[in-house]
Amino acid sequence: MTLVKICGITDLDTARTAVDAGADALGFVFAPGRRRIAPDTARAIIRRLPPEVLTVGVFVDEDPETVQGIAAHCGLGALQFHGRESPEYCRGFREKVIKAFGVGNASVRELERAEEYPVWCLLLDTFSPGRPGGTGRVFDWRLIESLKFSRPVILAGGLNPGNVQAAIAAVRPYGVDVSTGVETGGLKDPAKIRSFIKLAREAL
């Protein structure tokens, strides 16, 4: 079954909606941006979630000690890095680590470096200069058809209820990650969250 991660959680109601709909993982963004959440707020939400839900902290080129402090304070189960973090950087954490890579015509060659990373999963997102993620745009899935990864792949980048089944059929990823695609007017939409998870579960 494909793992489903809903990213950009900022409130308890949205977290509960996602969990009740069957989400496997929830993402909490600690990097600058409109979905950024304060560690104390994330901690309060996470403490009310079932233990089987994987809670993922999203960071961009953050100081390792700051990451470790937030992870311990919030009780995060995994860390997702969206910046220029090195393999050595990723090796320094006890939590599961997800390393994000941007996919675009000019960046596919860089994906070969992914094998150097001692991480739990690779996350493939749409490449956008100057933006670490959350673009809401789909990349051409054919760009990664010839690539073989030894680690599980989580697919991101412009996924939504209308294309998640096609994405899973084309890429056959370990998991799918969505944020913008389940929003309306910049806010998480409960109906879209439920639809996305249902369709992802029915894929393949």
UniProtKB/Swiss-Prot annotation:
**Which GO BP terms, alphabetically?**
L-tryptophan biosynthetic process
Reactions the enzyme catalyzes = N-(5-phospho-beta-D-ribosyl)anthranilate = 1-(2-carboxyphenylamino)-1-deoxy-D-ribulose 5-phosphate
**Entry's transmembrane regions:** none
Give the keywords, sorted: Amino-acid biosynthesis, Aromatic amino acid biosynthesis, Isomerase, Tryptophan biosynthesis
Q: Tell me the Gene3D superfamilies matching this sequence.
A: Aldolase class I
- Report which superkingdom the organism of origin falls in: Bacteria
Read off the SUPFAM superfamilies from this record. Answer: Ribulose-phoshate binding barrel
Instruction: Please tell me whether the keyword Glycosyltransferase is annotated for this protein.
Output: no
GO MF, any single term = phosphoribosylanthranilate isomerase activity
HAMAP family in the cross-refs: PRAI
Stated name of the protein: N-(5'-phosphoribosyl)anthranilate isomerase
Q: Which organism is it from?
A: Desulforudis audaxviator (strain MP104C)
Please state the gene responsible for encoding this protein: trpF
